[in-house]
């Protein structure tokens, strides 16, 4: 993928995974969940030494036992609550992304101190480090993806369908909901000021409508959906299902992508993005 040459151009010493694992006393396993177990078993674990530290950025494979590290190494997690590119960008700005720290295995007696040093090394201690666990990070991360994201997407699709059926221009609906990026700004202000305090920024009409609507909205279906998702994660049911899906070649994932991409919502969305020049700069 070119990363080997990029690293050499940046004057890093570059080695194969087995050689890097053998040379290092601290190994960051920063690979996609789907491929990390095989890579660890074949290329990393045989080359680790007693007392080494194996660090993860996500707790998934350890929590669900797809990776079971040997007993004589420290196993830690520094999980920045930010995408990788932004972690680096914040670091160069003398800032940092907050992280969740977890210690799964403390073979040396110094695993937590070593993990904190790693957190400092990527800038996270400038922002804050939460003392958590692999389970804490995994369940909250997946709940955000499997509960919050579907609720938001379903709400937008519902508004689109209802307003379109009432005769409103589809393009105007999409721009109002998210294509204008107004909500990008709103979410930034939520993070900076708080969910309620950021309401001081829009008009009082908006303030009244949002707060009153929040009080009026009660849906046992959402609470039940949330509880179901939590239990799937807690029990390991989702992890087992996803493992089978990978083994079968992603038939359900591919079907779901096709289903959504063929929907009227996405078709009109893509045309609107193109028409208004809203896509990424080439």
PLM features per residue range, with description:
Residues 1-10:
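NAD(P)-binding Rossmann-fold cofactor-contacting core
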Residues 16-68:
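Rossmann-fold NAD(P) dinucleotide-binding segment
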Residues 9-19, 82-83:
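Glycine-rich, highly charged phosphate/nucleotide-binding loops
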Residues 171-282:
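NAD(P)-dependent Rossmann-like dehydrogenase/reductase catalytic/cofactor-binding core
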Residues 55-145:
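Rossmann-fold dinucleotide-binding core
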Residues 109-123, 128-166, 171-191:
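Active-site-proximal catalytic alpha-helix in oxidoreductases
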Residues 4, 20, 36, 170-175:
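Small-residue helix-packing motif on alpha-helices
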